[in-house]
Amino acid sequence: MIHLEKIDSTNIWEIVDLKVFKSQKSFVAANWVSIVQAYGVRDSATAAFPFAIYNDKRPVGFLMIGFNEAALYENWDDVEAPKSLVNNYSLWRLMIDKRYQKRGYGREAIKLALDFIRTWPCGKAEYCSLSYEPENEVARELYRSLGFMENGETDGDE
């Protein structure tokens, strides 16, 4: 059964070791990068919730949820950042290890992430956004099938 677990000292290295196919490396940051980013924003107006994705006791992927408070944007010059991120949640990262793709784990993990977001850990919000590389058709179709809609905003090249 698919479930999420917080990243901690007992599972960090097995999550860092998960990899995507070479052809997918440009679609998602390495898990260690995401974990460092989560650590780096812990004292800012951004919240990060990094999770390991497990199938029973086997680690199969990584997911990170973000939340950006309005204070983050008050003096921010990044004109490329979508305004829909203000006071809203985001599915910041999602990766399934190359050995476990095409088994429905990504879909189930997103559903669990949305359940977590509905607990409002940083307060209520209007949206949950995400971004993906335009070339990543598999991600686009997965997100659409779960009810996500494109709104025309971009986050850099995503």
State each model region's role:
Residues 107, 134-152:
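Conserved active-site alpha-helix within GNAT-family acetyltransferase domains
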Residues 87, 124-127, 143, 147-149:
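Non-catalytic interaction surface on structured domains
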Residues 97-103, 134-135:
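Active-site acidic-Proline motif in GNAT/NAT acetyltransferases
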Residues 2-99, 110-112, 116-122, 155:
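Acetyl-CoA-dependent GNAT
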